[in-house]
A protein has these predicted regions:
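A Rossmann-like FAD-binding core segment of flavoenzymes
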Residues: 290-332, 337, 393-494, 536-540
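N-terminal Rossmann-like FAD-binding beta1-loop-alpha1 element of flavoenzymes
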Residues: 231-258, 385-393
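Glycine-rich dinucleotide-binding loop and its adjacent helix/turn
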Residues: 212-232, 341-395, 491-495, 501-502
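Cytosolic regulatory regions built on CNB/CRP/Popeye-like sensor folds
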Residues: 1-165
């Protein structure tokens, strides 16, 4: 990314007089006068509007759950407050107070802010770029958002850190073994070691060893699900296919909700770099691509509920209903199944015991830091495996790649060539994982691979093993309503609409659909194509 100082004009732009007058038409209320030092919006305030300053100043600060604050900037006339959370009415990560002489400002609640961005393409581009860059700055600088207190690199810390990072939320890890504010808080709160990690939400609330769902609830990022509200489209899955549906459907005026049990991006979101996606000649990370699509969906008014697990689809009578965890319900006139696939796990004893303790199914910057300078192994021969190899190899001493057959049968040529040029990558063909061993702390210590040709076993000492061996369809929750093939993928196209399943009004796109091309671009294409078929359905109902 460019030097932060060079992006300041884009991060904190000043609207012209003409742009301010145009923006007035979209304000959610009359201009308001704030006294010197008065709170304009507070850290953690949900639904806080963005404010367009007409005169005076607003001093913006960041803070965390330990009540540590630091200045970010001072907005003047023609500038506006807020960051990405203001698009969806989520709790503010930053706070603002009127300057020494007070200020006058116009409010734009989430709906009116989105209306302004859509109503004026010029102003919308300025605002969207600024909101995204401000979030990036908050993540890069730290000192804002959620604090995780525990042992860095532990399975529990990694899981929460992955959720926050892939959700684009700033976070900081404090080592409980080092005396400081984190350890002091643990001792003060009487938190035992088996209750770690301790999580401090931006508002100061403490969570002991929370799940990602509990953390999301504390952060206020899960919208309220109204069982009586009828959406035009409910999308299950926030990967490339699901987010594409959300963007196109919402931009065409349909009411849309997207639900995902984990985080945005799906399996593609874990890709370190996608180099063959149209329009990105230098490549783009899966997380960056998902983040852009996520913000684009918010811009057009789509509701996104993450992490919310959909447990079953009810399709026997009345509107289609998604039954979620804790019996929460979402009703819609159409349902798009974009739930993708689940990571496939090899049949190896005790595998689950090492997940998060040395065994991983994705490769992000977090994993790269953990295995820096070490010998690691990776199993898999598809494009996702290739992208992970190219990303991880510069960080590690040696990367052993284990595949069952020649890479030319399963991987794109550009990745094969890139891997061949990496001096620290060893390719082991025809060897399969057969056993795992742990150390006294329960972390991975070694892996044994068996050669298929003669059964010879070889043991490798290693603390990090990455598994990229494909995926199985994530469609079990919908099988009571839709037909699947023998492998569990959802069948579509029996009627006049190619992406509609055996149940009218229920569509399947992306990796979960039988016969689909397992590529990000193909998933995005299906996400766009399904919207026209939904329009056709709704026009007949």
């Amino acid at each position: 990314m460019s030097d932060p100082d060079t992006r300041a004009p884009q991060m904190f732009p000043v609207l012209s007089h003409a742009q301010i007058e145009l923006a007035r038409r979209f304000a959610s209320g009359p201009e308001h006068r704030f006294a010197p030092g008065e709170t304009v919006y507070a850290i953690g305030e949900r639904g806080a509007p963005a404010w367009l300053i007409l005169d005076g100043e607003i001093k913006v600060t960041r803070g965390d759950g330990l009540d540590r604050t630091a200045p970010i900037t001072v907005h003047g006339a023609g500038q506006f407050t807020g960051e990405v959370n203001q698009l969806a009415g989520r709790p503010s990560i930053a706070g603002g107070h009127a300057g020494d002489l007070g200020c006058t400002a116009l409010p734009f609640d989430p709906a009116h802010l989105r209306a302004l961005m859509i109503g004026s393409a010029e102003i919308g581009e300025i605002i969207m770029r600024a909101l995204i860059l401000r979030r990036v700055r908050l993540i890069e600088q730290g000192g804002a958002g959620t604090i995780l207190i525990g042992i860095p690199g532990s399975a529990e810390i990694i899981a929460l850190q992955e959720f926050l990072t892939r959700s684009g939320l700033p976070n900081l890890v404090l080592d409980v073994r080092v005396y400081g504010e984190g350890r002091a808080l643990v001792e003060q709160a009487g938190v035992s070691s088996d209750e770690l990690p301790l999580v401090v939400c931006p508002g100061g609330a403490l969570l002991r060893r929370p799940t990602s769902v509990e953390l999301a609830a504390c952060l206020g990022i899960i919208p309220d699900l109204d069982p009586d509200h009828l959406y035009d489209v409910a999308v299950v899955g926030a990967g490339p296919a699901g987010l594409a549906t959300a963007v196109y459907a919402a931009s065409e005026g349909l009411s849309v909700i997207v639900l995902d049990a984990r985080t945005m991006g799906g399996q593609a979101g874990a890709s370190a770099r996608i180099e063959n996606y149209l329009g990105f000649p230098t490549g783009i990370s899966g997380q960056a691509l998902a983040g852009r699509a996520f913000n684009q969906a918010l811009k057009f008014g789509a509701e996104i509920a993450i992490p919310v697990a959909v447990e079953r689809l009810v399709c026997d009578a009345g509107p289609l209903t998604l039954v979620c965890a804790e019996e929460r319900r979402v009703s819609a006139r159409s349902v798009v199944i974009a739930s993708g696939a689940q990571y496939r796990r090899p049949d190896v004893p005790n595998l689950a015991a090492f997940e998060g303790k040395g065994v991983a199914y994705w490769a992000s910057a977090i994993e790269a830091r953990l295995c820096a300078g070490e010998d690691i192994a990776l199993v898999g021969g598809g494009n996702s495996a290739g992208q992970a190899i190219v990303f991880l190899a510069p960080f590690v001493r040696t990367l052993r790649l284990f595949v069952r057959r020649d890479l030319s049968e399963t991987m794109s040529r550009y990745l094969i060539d890139r891997i061949a040029a990496l001096p620290n990558v060893e390719i082991h063909s025809g060897e399969e994982l057969s056993a795992l061993e742990g150390d006294e702390a329960g972390n991975l210590a070694a892996a044994t691979f068996r050669r298929a040709a003669d059964g010879e076993a070889r043991r490798y000492a290693l603390r990090h093993l990455f598994l990229f061996i494909g995926a199985d369809p994530n469609a079990g929750w919908a099988r009571d309503c839709v037909a699947t093939d023998e492998d569990g993928f959802i069948v579509s196209g029996a009627g006049s609409r190619s992406l509609e399943t055996s149940r009218a009004g229920v569509f399947a796109i992306g990796d979960v659909r039988a016969g689909s091309t397992k590529r990000v671009a193909a998933a995005v294409g299906e996400g766009a194509a399904v919207v026209s078929q939904i329009h056709s359905l709704l026009a007949q109902s």
